[in-house]
Amino acid sequence: QRWALPLPQVDPGDVVVEAFGCDPPPSFVDAMARPSSKPPVWINLEYLSAEDYVERNHGLPSPQPSSFGALTKWFFYPGFTAGSGGLLREADALNPGTPPWAELDLLPHPGERCVSLFAYADAPFGELFDLLADRPTLLLITAGASQSPALKALEGRPQRHLRAHALPWLTQRDYDRLLHACDLNFARGEDSVVRAMWAGAPF
């Protein structure tokens, strides 16, 4: 459920996951430390990184004060080595199914490079499009905050060999299928970058 302040009375679960250092409200921390209950396992999920500090910090305890005594928060760092928290991958992540061309009513032309674009709204779209236009390219622009500025950057620009298509909102499954169908994927955000890596065509 979505939380709002003041926080309603909520009993902590056996495991509490705090994402990216966003501390739970003090009243919830106190509930976690109540003497009448066993303290939950408190995990601080950190950002994905390939930096050396990930292995140094993964699994470290961090004592936290509360009205009823100290709790322990444990750092969890996703990463790319055995000394990190690793990455999640479901059994069929490397083979999510057939390309979603039929659902999108779209088909790449023979010899056309397929490129997906999921970016921030202030990305340098114009420069990218100029580079992509040097050879036959089907550019698939995902729905979201970047779609409108990306389409605007195409206006009045010689598109040469670039064919752009604005995509509707996709399910995670269909987005995975799209990533696997493309030759190059521009992705933003940890989860999407990892999904592009599983597809074998990240950027």
What are these language model-derived features?
Residues 26-30, 54-55, 126-127, 151, ...:
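Short glycine-/acidic-enriched loop or helix-start segments at secondary-structure transitions
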Residues 1-67, 144:
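Active-site and donor-binding regions of nucleotide-sugar-utilizing enzymes
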Residues 17, 41-43, 75-78, 140, ...:
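Hydrophobic/aromatic beta-strand patches that form the interior of the parallel beta-sheet core
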Residues 12-14, 39, 71-72, 136, ...:
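Short, well-ordered alpha-helix to beta-strand connector turns
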Residues 46-126:
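A nucleotide-sugar donor-handling region in carbohydrate enzymes
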Residues 100, 108-176:
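Donor-nucleotide binding loops and adjacent catalytic segments primarily
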Residues 170-203:
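A donor-sugar binding/catalytic signature common to diverse glycosyltransferases
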